[in-house]
Amino acid sequence: MLEEQLGDGGVAGIIVNTVKKAQELAHYLQKALPGWQIIPFHSRFTSLGRAKVEKEVLSLAGKGTAESRQKIRDRLVIVGTQVIEQSLDVDFDLMITELSPMDLLLQRIGRLHRHKDRVRPKNLEEPVCHVLIPGDKKTDRSVSAVYSDWLQYQTEKHLPQSIDIPEDIPRLVNAVYKDADESDQLQEEQDKYHNYLNEEKGKEDKAEIAILAPPYKKLRMDHGINGLKISNAKTSEERGLATVRDIKPSISCILLKGEKAGAFRPVDDEHMLLKSDQKLSFREVQTLLKEVISLPISIPYEAAETELEQTTKNRFPLWMDNPIMKDRLILVLNEKGDAELAGFNLHYSTEFGLESRKIR
């Protein structure tokens, strides 16, 4: 479809619901469409790496100048995740997206033909968005970890063939999020709806525990800064819940490439050489803080944290004396960008970000 639709040029945006899918699809398209520009864009880059990719995406698919908007862009495909829908001012001639809850889906569609004065290929002058509906929902459970089954079901049910934006937005969003009439539901629908209600109730309970209290002097004295974060948490269980996010926790760590004899390089700055037996300068610390990345939640949290803590403590004790670096975790890759961690093979590249595969 891409070869046909973008045969005369243009930019396609493909948005999927997981980073792993985005990476796999980008790999596939690079092989299937030689000579095309395929750019993966997702959250699993280092802070600096993501900023570089974002800059490239905006330069190629952003608003640009009035002169650039009169030129047809040539066979560019951006394969991304939710990061595309959130804030980027990008403009796609064609969009392909996996199903997501209606409000988020409409945000994605808002990146289609976003700039009205842009010249587009003849066959892409009308905005078209292809929404991919999961085939075997019981087999593919990856989306359930991201979005509610009920919201996905409701969105698929109420998704029309054509949409007028922004006129249709309130009606469509309300159709998905309104209270359901359970008397008309099948058992499977009721199960999805009740699970959704329980999830929402759980979020509300966590939010109540973590509500900021007024900045009373006694609270500051008793609990310090943490006291401001956890207002009425009286038990250790409540304190734990107050720090739990709505998604599974992931580990943030600094990525380095290991050289020889205790020398290391930041993955995004190969010109900087760091020695583990030397104190870090302020500039070096600032660089390292830009090399932070969140590990996939599929990696066992406790096992990975324990392994990284041990590695960091043993290999970088002098660095940890720096107050800014204290409690930071460091993941060391080999010169090819590979590492093993908690039963997973990891590989980092500036093009695809951090990829993971479970060791069988």
What residues fall within each predicted segment?
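C-terminal helicase lobe and adjacent C-terminal extensions/tails of nucleic-acid helicase motors
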Residues: 1-15, 20-59, 65-67, 71, ...
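Short amphipathic alpha-helical segments, especially helix-boundary/capping motifs
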Residues: 30-33, 82-86
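Conserved two-lobed SF2 helicase motor
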Residues: 69-85
